[in-house]
């Protein structure tokens, strides 16, 4: 369990700390938008006009509105190649291009 959260915790924490607006897509297709207020092992508190508790098992995708640096503790840098937002210059452009083609 700790290995799986070693990726999601720094990512979610960076989004929370920097107050980055996010779109959260649920497995049923619903899109939620807001800022991550807090999170734990099972839920994310998403704040917009109201706070919503979203269970992680219902989440398909978390999409930040801008690239976020969440690899500050990664000395090797190898794992960052697995993420679209690992490169600050290209991440948001690639995301916008993929959204336009849908």
UniProtKB/Swiss-Prot annotation:
Top-level taxon of the source organism: Bacteria
**Could you tell me which Pfam families the record lists for this protein?**
Hfq
Give start-end positions of Low complexity composition bias: 70-88
What is the protein's given name?
RNA-binding protein Hfq
What is a biological process (GO) this protein takes part in?
Answer: regulation of translation, ncRNA-mediated
What PROSITE patterns is this protein classified in?
SM
Instruction: Give every Sm domain span.
Output: 9-68
The record's Gene Ontology cellular component field reads: cytosol
What happens biologically when this protein's gene is inactivated, per the record?
Drastically decreases survival in host macrophages. Cells display drastically reduced virulence in vitro and in vivo. Mice infected with the deletion mutant show no signs of illness during the course of the experiment.
Keyword RNA-binding on entry: yes
């Amino acid at each position: 369990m700790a290995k799986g959260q070693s990726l999601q915790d720094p990512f979610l924490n960076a989004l929370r700390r920097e107050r980055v607006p996010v779109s959260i897509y649920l497995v049923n297709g619903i899109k939620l938008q807001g800022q991550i207020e807090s999170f734990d092992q099972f839920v994310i508190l998403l704040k917009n006009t109201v706070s919503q508790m979203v269970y992680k098992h219902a989440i398909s995708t978390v999409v930040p509105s801008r690239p976020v640096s969440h690899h500050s503790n990664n000395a090797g840098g190898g794992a960052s190649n697995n993420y679209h937002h690992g490169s600050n210059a290209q991440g948001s452009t690639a995301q916008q291009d993929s959204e336009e083609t849908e």
